Amino acid sequence: MRLRRISFVLAVVSIFAFASFASADILAPGATGAPDVLAPGGTLLASLSGLWTNTTSTMSGTYLTAVYSDPANTFGAGDLDFVYQVTNNANSVDSVGRTTAINFTGFMTDVGFTPLGSSLGAGFVNGTVIPISVDRSGSGDSIGFSFTPPISAAINPGQTSTVLVIETNATNFTSGFYNLIDGGVTTVAAFEPAAARVPEGSALSMLGISGIAVLGAMKRKFVS
């Protein structure tokens, strides 16, 4: 009887642990919020760096993006972190007010930044400009990092962003795109998740219903 009670308690703890995970600070499609302070890292799977110039040639700089298999990922050990860093050259006369990454349709995301970029290696540095807010499009494909208002909070000439982070439940990736926005849009090569698992809403619903059903069945068994 004691063993049954212990099993019942463990089942309850497991279900509430999942509920706590499900209510974590996850950026759902259509949502806007404050960025989380995250700690990406792990095994570097791929990286890209390059130069960029906006369409009116009033601004230019460098960018770096990478994918890590993260043992401490929000969604599961080994799931993928997508990270980005932008530098605006000192001779630019315009500022980067926003960036967006695509395509994250069908994946769960926890979005924010880390001020400790150099800990990642791969050329990342400890940038100084943090996003004011993060958002996700209604369809879930686009993840945005906004640095304004005020304009003084943008990635101004001579400045480098903190490392911007999108933790996901993806386990595979492919080529994607990253946009730098100052009124116009400059698009550069990046990475995106691939081979989506069960869509997030369905996954949560199915697991939640299953957990309730199991708990109910166990309770009836123990009572009887």
Regions of interest found by a model, annotated:
Residues M1-R2, G216-M218:
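Short alpha-helical segments used as structural interaction elements across diverse proteins
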Residues D25-A196:
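Extracellular or exported targeting regions of proteins
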Residues L10-A17:
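Bacterial N-terminal signal peptides
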Residues M1-V9:
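Bacterial N-terminal signal peptides that target proteins for export
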Residues R220-S224:
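Short, charged juxtamembrane terminal tails flanking transmembrane helices
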